Amino acid sequence: MVKVTDIVLWDKPGERVLLLGNQAIVRGALEGNIGVYAAYPGTPSSEITDTMAAVASRAGVYMEYSTNEKVAFETALSASWAGLRAMTAMKHVGLNVAMDSFMTVSYMGVNGGLVVVVADDPSMWSSQNEQDTRAIAKFANIPVLEPSSVQEAKDMVKYAFEISEKYGQMVILRTTTRSSHMRGDVVLGELPQEIKEGKRKFGDFKKNPERYVDIPAFQRPKHKWLLETIEKFREEFNNSPFNWIEGPEDAKVGIIAPGLSYAYVKEALAWLGVDNVKVLKLGTPFPVPYGLLEKFFQGLERVLIVEELEPVVEEQVKVWAFDKGINVEIHGKDLVPRVYEMTTRRAVEAIAKFLGLETPINFEEIDEKYKKVQEIVPPRPPSLCPACPHRNTFFALRKAATPRAIYPSDIGCYTLGVLPPLKTVDTTIAMGGSIGVAHGLSIALNGSIAEEQRKTGKGKKIIAATIGDSTFFHTGLPALANAIYNRSNVLIVVLDNLVTAMTGDQPNPGTGETPHGPGKRILIEEVAKAMGADFVAVVDPYDIKETYETFKKALEVEGVSVVVARRACALYRIGQLRRAGKQWPIYQVNEDKCTGCKICINAYGCPAIYWDPEKKKAKVDPLMCWGCGGCAQVCPFDAFEKVREGEL
């Protein structure tokens, strides 16, 4: 069976293959002769990085999982300054992390082509917001390409390298959840000889302080260069192979569709049976090419702009039309919603209203049927996996802390601790935010902490932050230093499951693994000690009693306590055992001992445990049990017994 990673490296120009959008981006980078790739994983961009990790050594590409997006951007940037083609990929909020360097570098430019892939998440399927990268690019005056198909996702990367080098400026490839994760036909192009031979490429950095040092005297003239360069891109995009006009030349109405919205518009027009509309397909939402706009607007009386999220194209078109004195009725966000992702339904409804047509489908009737289905189908909220070590950590923490404890948390699987029965997540904002929020609360609630001590005598802390291992290295370190330096009074629990689990089991500095072989492992507890934390301990969350006792000690210490809860991600570990042909333990309920107290369900909440309403007993689904033994530790009646031995 052929692996996708083999297909991505196929030396078969003209071959038609099926690829994920993110996999196609990697193929495009290889066809573009990439030399360096660096990224921090983040959904929906993660498969780009994982695919590159799988092929990099064979293709002669230096590839790394960086500690965060800022570091990844700077790594790729410096490779570009040394003359190599380089790429980084991140989710949309990852660009916020890289923003400081990103905005400064916009004035400096690049040498080798530099492509910044940013995967937006309209509808927030796995993100905390749905910010539009096109708006950020417009603010920064950085050009944006946006694919409408998997084929374009591949082809645009090579094109981006070329125009980046031509004009000496980085280029953003903006994708979305759908364009990242859709599959489609891709016709493979030619691979460069260096990629086929797997030869590492090395560059040459030529010193030029006036360009590369960002003191005001050097930077001041570059703003003008930035503005002049974006206009060169605008001119370039008039002839871009990813922009075109289709439909009858004598049409009176037109639709502008950037990126993936083009695919929805084409489907919507087919649904509506409309063929007398002119369509401007835009693969370059910023800057919009004015020459192409002039051609498109000829003979039109009304125009609709169909785009996801912010009116980035709409605003550019309206400003251009106003400045040109063009008297054409232009619609956009008055008909197309500004929130959530584009769908065929949304495109159909907007275009139908624009054209004064009835929709071919009764969507209201579908909505009513959907509501009825929702009433029948049991809800399936997300849950921590069976045997997830975080469940045990949360259970022990909640038991050890005062009832009034506050739990700032972070971005990762463990955010699911917000749900019952664990309820040990009170705030999340961004990667690394847990420690900063915990510190701020300790300052704001210092009097409350003293009062709590007097009332309960239960610990010197009421604030316990939780943060994952990868997140700790991502942006937790500065916040920890700040908390220690400013004598905060918090407990920080680092949930170390020995992998970057939520985005697909990628390595991080705490694992010591890299795509090219062993790296140097950095132990979280040693970092905390070196920073001067007042209490540092490491626990195995599969030992709930030990974890509980350690939390009690940590909560008694005045100052910053750091507890590292270390145990491999259960999902990752089970995968290892399956591949090795080994089995894991399984537990079952001894019905003679079970009293039906429901502590295992109402306080612990493992999804492998369910309630038998007839027998009024707890039961374990053997197909879901992964044998951590947490249930046996929390049951006060010893009703859970191991029925199969194994490793975990």
UniProtKB/Swiss-Prot annotation:
Cofactor section: [4Fe-4S] cluster
Subunit structure, interactors included: Heterodimer of the IorA and IorB subunits.
Cofactor: binding comment: Binds 2 [4Fe-4S] clusters. In this family the first cluster has a non-standard and varying [4Fe-4S] binding motif CX(2)CX(2)CX(4-5)CP.
Highest taxon of source: Archaea
Domain 4Fe-4S ferredoxin-type: 585-614, 616-645
Gene3D superfamilies to which the protein is assigned, alphabetical: 3.30.70.20, 3.40.50.970
Ligand binding ([4Fe-4S] cluster 2): C606, C625, C628, C631
Pfam families for the chain: Fer4_7, POR_N, TPP_enzyme_C
Keywords, comma-separated and alphabetical: 4Fe-4S, Electron transport, Iron, Iron-sulfur, Metal-binding, Oxidoreductase, Repeat, Transport
Residues the entry annotates as binding [4Fe-4S] cluster 1: C594, C597, C600, C635
Function in brief: Catalyzes the ferredoxin-dependent oxidative decarboxylation of arylpyruvates.
Keyword 4Fe-4S set for record: yes
Transmembrane region(s): none
SUPFAM superfamilies: 4Fe-4S ferredoxins, Thiamin diphosphate-binding fold (THDP-binding), TK C-terminal domain-like
EC number of the protein: 1.2.7.8
Reaction(s) catalysed (UniProt annotation): indole-3-pyruvate + 2 oxidized [2Fe-2S]-[ferredoxin] + CoA = (indol-3-yl)acetyl-CoA + 2 reduced [2Fe-2S]-[ferredoxin] + CO2 + H(+)
One Gene Ontology biological process: sulfur compound biosynthetic process
Source organism per UniProt: Pyrococcus abyssi (strain GE5 / Orsay)
InterPro entries: 4Fe4S_Fe-S-bd, 4Fe4S_Fe_S_CS, HACL1-like, IorA, Pyrv_Fd/Flavodoxin_OxRdtase_N, THDP-binding, TPP_enzyme_TPP-bd, Transketo_C/PFOR_II
GO molecular function, one term: 4 iron, 4 sulfur cluster binding
NCBIfam families: IOR_alpha (TIGR03336)
CDD domains, alphabetized: TPP_IOR_alpha (cd02008), TPP_PYR_PFOR_IOR-alpha_like (cd07034)
Lineage of source species: Archaea, Methanobacteriati, Methanobacteriota, Thermococci, Thermococcales
Protein's UniProt name: Indolepyruvate oxidoreductase subunit IorA
